[in-house]
Structure formats: C-alpha cells, structure tokens
Design a protein with these regions (language model features):
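Short amphipathic alpha-helical interaction segments
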Residues: 39-50, 66
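Hydrophobic residues on short alpha-helical segments
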Residues: 15-22
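Short, cationic-aromatic polyanion-contact patches
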Residues: 4-15, 29, 59-75
Length: 75
C-alpha cells in the first residue's frame, strides 16, 4: 500500500486540513474538527468521507456520548 503522503496528494485542501488537524490535535469529534479547522460541517463531513475512502482516518463511537463518533488517524 502507498504511504499516507502519497494517498493525501490527490485529496482536496479541506481533507488535507482535517488530516493535519487530527495529526496535531489527536482524536476529535466532527464538531471539534469544525471548530479547529473553521470549515463548515458539510465540508468536514465530506473531507472525513474522502479520508476514510483512502484509509487515512478511522472512526469509533465515543464512550462519553454514543451519538458522537471520534475520528483519528488510521494506524
């Protein structure tokens, strides 16, 4: 499989920003990503879906609030 850097190359700037935010901040909810990146909720959702397609981001259910998902960089 190609490196994360190679998989990031053809993604939109919003996806790269979300990736870098997760790299710097660690695990975040979508709401936290919206706040940190200052992107719209819709744009963050799209960026996350693109990152998941490239297997760069993983999601899991939050233990504090099962309605929320936590996103982190894939290992």
């Amino acid at each position: 499989m190609s490196s994360a850097k190679e998989r990031l190359e053809d993604l939109p700037p919003s996806a790269k920003l979300v990736y870098k935010t997760l790299e710097f901040e660690g695990e975040c909810t979508q709401k936290e990503l919206v706040k940190e990146t200052r992107l719209s909720s819709r744009t963050v959702r799209y960026a996350i879906s693109r990152l998941e397609e490239k297997e760069l981001v993983e999601q899991r259910v939050s233990f504090r609030d099962a309605r929320q998902k936590l996103y982190s960089l894939a290992e």
